């Protein structure tokens, strides 16, 4: 998760030891009465991320059935915890003076800065440096990627943030309202992206958050829906995961993006969690 990216060491870890330790942490997380930020919650998830960014040669597709089931459960727990962490901090930010000038108070802000820089470089290398209009699907209560892109990289671009949670959008909207210039070019839409159709054709670039479509079936459906309605030659940036990082996030594979032109795939080897898959809808 972007919110929990931390520094790794260079130690190699065997698949057997990795799986055993991940299962142990999953068991501990599963017994918690709440995933709201606390010393215990933060410690467990920090240890999990440290483990998953260690160099390893694990093949996620070859995991035994019971380990795959644990992995799916763990991804859901990670997503829930990340959402609660962002909501708590976004609520705090919305109540202070100049919240957009204080984003760096968020403990993992620099990790979002790193990821946004990587994604902007990938877009720039594919000729998409200053899109007129961008959509971010699954923006949440603290849409740091949109904030960073809009203020550091795409300073004239209009951003529409889509989230299924109206309360999350309300908090994010309060933060943006503190900056009249940014508020003019950043809006929030509440609803299921599967119900958004013609509007998707307005965007030069669409970001798909890693936790939108938690299961393989849902992810493929969402990718197909976006491809159907997005503009021709528009680009879609999808966050994925590789290796042990796939205990934290769903994986998007090449067979999941049929009908798209695959422009590039980036896999991190440092403290960044997310892989980045850049796609283009072909012109027909």
Segments the model singles out, each with a brief description of its role:
Residues 244-284:
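Active-site capping/gating segments
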Residues 46-129:
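Conserved Class I S-adenosyl-L-methionine-dependent methyltransferase catalytic core
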Residues 220-235:
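A short glycine-rich, Lys/Arg-flanked "PGG" loop and its adjoining helix->strand segment in the class I
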Residues 158-164:
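Conserved SAM-binding motif I beta-strand of class I
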Residues 233-243:
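Conserved beta-strand signature within the Rossmann-like core of class I S-adenosyl-L-methionine
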Residues 141-156:
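Conserved SAM-binding loop of SAM-dependent methyltransferases across substrates and taxa
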Residues 193-195, 202-219:
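A short SAM/SAH-binding and catalytic strip from SAM-dependent methyltransferases
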Residues 170-203:
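S-adenosyl-L-methionine
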């Amino acid at each position: 998760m972007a919110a929990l990216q931390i520094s790794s060491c260079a130690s190699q870890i065997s698949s057997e030891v990795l799986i055993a330790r991940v299962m142990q942490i999953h068991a501990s997380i599963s017994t918690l009465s709440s995933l709201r930020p606390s010393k215990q919650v933060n410690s467990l998830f920090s240890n999990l991320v440290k483990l998953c960014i260690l160099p390893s040669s694990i093949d996620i597709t070859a995991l035994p059935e019971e380990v795959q089931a644990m992995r799916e459960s763990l991804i859901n727990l990670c997503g829930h915890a990340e959402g609660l962490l962002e909501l708590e901090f976004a609520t705090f930010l919305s109540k202070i003076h100049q919240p957009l000038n204080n984003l760096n108070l968020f403990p993992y802000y620099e990790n979002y800065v790193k990821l946004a820089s990587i994604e902007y470089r990938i877009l720039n290398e594919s000729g998409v440096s200053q899109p007129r209009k961008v959509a971010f699907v699954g923006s949440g209560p603290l849409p740091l990627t949109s904030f960073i892109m809009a203020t550091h990289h795409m300073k004239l671009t209009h951003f529409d943030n889509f989230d299924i949670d109206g309360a999350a959008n309300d908090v994010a909207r309060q933060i943006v309202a503190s900056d009249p210039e940014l508020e003019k070019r950043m809006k929030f839409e509440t609803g299921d992206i599967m119900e958004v159709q013609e509007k998707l054709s307005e965007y030069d670039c669409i970001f798909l958050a890693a936790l939108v479509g938690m299961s393989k079936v849902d992810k493929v459906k969402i990718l197909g829906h976006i491809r159907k309605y997005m503009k021709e030659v528009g680009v879609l940036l999808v966050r994925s995961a590789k290796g042990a990082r796939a205990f934290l996030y769903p994986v998007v594979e090449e067979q999941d993006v049929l009908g798209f032109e695959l422009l590039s795939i980036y896999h991190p080897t440092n403290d960044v969690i997310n892989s980045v898959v850049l796609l283009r809808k072909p012109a027909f």
